[in-house]
């Protein structure tokens, strides 16, 4: 009986910790990752808040780690896009380049988490509506292939093969 109840306790603890993290550390709404990206593209010239580079991935990791039900796609896409957006903002890139960096972050995120570079490319072209030109396709493809390659290379590492340094 006690062991059966633990299956309910862990997700509740995870949601409680996530709620505390969002309320007292982030102090902003971090829900609906893809919607936030689309809003940033349409209303904020592609600028995504800095805390989105880390907040959604930490909150979803806590929830998933404790057995809660949350998808991994939206937080990782928001994180990748936020990294691209903030790098473009730091280096004062023009609007078109900033949008491309947001797309590269999203393509890399989807490709890395699903190990599918073409899916990352198609997701970015379809959902974020990046223009279908060679000057935008090439960086998106490079981002997606690089992310998928890095993801595959890291998931094949085993502790016994690396001397247990992982």
Predicted regions and their residues:
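Alpha-helical transmembrane segments and immediately membrane-proximal extracytoplasmic
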Residues: 1-164
């Amino acid at each position: 009986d006690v062991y059966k109840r633990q299956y309910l306790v862990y997700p509740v603890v995870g949601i409680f910790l996530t709620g505390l993290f969002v309320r007292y550390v982030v102090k902003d709404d971090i829900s609906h990752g893809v919607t936030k990206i689309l809003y940033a593209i349409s209303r904020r010239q592609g600028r995504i808040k800095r805390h989105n580079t880390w907040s959604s991935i930490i909150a979803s990791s806590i929830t998933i780690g404790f057995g809660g039900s949350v998808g991994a796609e939206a937080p990782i896409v928001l994180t990748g896009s936020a990294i691209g957006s903030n790098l473009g903002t730091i280096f004062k890139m023009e609007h078109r380049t900033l949008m491309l960096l947001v797309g590269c972050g999203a393509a890399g995120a989807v490709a890395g988490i699903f190990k599918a570079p073409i899916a990352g490319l198609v997701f970015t072209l379809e959902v974020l509506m990046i223009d279908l030109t060679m000057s935008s396709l090439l960086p998106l493809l490079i981002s997606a292939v690089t992310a998928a390659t890095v993801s595959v290379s890291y998931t094949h590492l085993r502790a016994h093969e690396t001397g247990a340094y992982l």
